[in-house]
């Protein structure tokens, strides 16, 4: 009798799992915006892992309802629509460049980012490029110490290690001085940020919010959609954006990764207003009691003395368009002479890969650099498979060997560049919340290109002959990783 009841229970569980898989399969195919590759990948997971497939889907596969995010993010747009309309009209009249040759030459790209992302163009910026974590954090801490009104700081990862505690200590001192300090961190990325450190930060007068916190113990049903942005705005006059997170490993103190090679920007000029707007929207999406409203001090007029053109573009699962991806594609298709790409994870879709092949086959000098260290095994092998597929088209591929390469940069024709948080993979393009600076300036483009060339001396060039010698186990790892790449 007991055995019969056990069999009934098992059968009920199996039927329930099967029905759940059918429901999720229906949702994936008919109700969510997905690529064909992503649909097939999730269907394979649900079919071949019937007992755990729906759990994996709950954790990793659910898409955010865009309407929900729009409700979270509604905030006065501080005249944004008017600015965008004015700039689009100026583009039509050819009255837009203020002497910037790159803006005239790449006006279609400027228009695309304006139209799709409301990424208004600023032309009076000055910036500093960082490729080393020590330099970046030395300057950031110095800027924090000189803050007069407020500090808005947002990172995907903040660790409770030496660097993390040092940064929190500097922020706490400013909060005690009466400076407004607001810190937004990602709940998953900053899971090692200790509660006692946050408690102390708040006791000192700081305000902290986590992005998409878990409502259940030990599990976060929105773990697949993370805020990967790294933004700092100080007094509305200085802004930071780029790839560095906060932790000892990002200044080269990790035994696993060694030296951490990244790219980050310090901006002075009106582009800081765009970073400020992005921070306010993100902050208000998570804060229920301490919303930021439009104040003139948050958007001051800044006389940086600079002449660099910048658009700040953001993307995320709340958007209808993959704006940063489109920006990358527009840059690649516009290149006439050279393309330089650095990305720790290189798992774009086939159309993206084809755009790179087309550029290379058309005579453009295409160079891609990826790390030779394995941050995430499946991602590493999928990246290797993708970059190797470009070799026969004439693309130059380099494996960075001097630690871990985390830089996300794209430079074309010594004229236009992009630096930010978005990797060249499906996760950054469609799942995570990202932010990039698109920069129209020869000097900046050449500096980033030179940084790439310097890194070549610390890298190994991958050849078709070398790649062909890989063993059966490597081929198997690549195959499995490639199959899973749409959901990595």
From Swiss-Prot:
Reaction equations catalysed: 2 a 1,2-diacyl-sn-glycero-3-phospho-(1'-sn-glycerol) = a cardiolipin + glycerol
The annotated topology with respect to the bilayer is: Multi-pass membrane protein
The record describes the protein's role as: Catalyzes the reversible phosphatidyl group transfer from one phosphatidylglycerol molecule to another to form cardiolipin (CL) (diphosphatidylglycerol) and glycerol.
- Looking at its record, which EC class is this enzyme? transferase
Q: Which SUPFAM superfamilies match?
A: Phospholipase D/nuclease
Q: Name one GO cellular component term.
A: plasma membrane
**Keywords from the named record:** Cell membrane, Lipid biosynthesis, Lipid metabolism, Membrane, Phospholipid biosynthesis, Phospholipid metabolism, Repeat, Transferase, Transmembrane, Transmembrane helix
Q: What is its main location?
A: membrane
Provide a GO biological process annotation.
Answer: cardiolipin biosynthetic process
Question: Cellular location of this protein?
Answer: Cell membrane
* GO MF annotations in UniProt: cardiolipin synthase activity
Q: Which EC number applies?
A: 2.7.8.-
Record PROSITE patterns:
PLD
Q: Report the source organism.
A: Staphylococcus epidermidis (strain ATCC 35984 / DSM 28319 / BCRC 17069 / CCUG 31568 / BM 3577 / RP62A)
Q: Which residues form the active site?
A: 228, 230, 235, 406, 408, 413
Q: What family is it from? A: Belongs to the phospholipase D family. Cardiolipin synthase subfamily.
Name of this chain's protein: Cardiolipin synthase 2
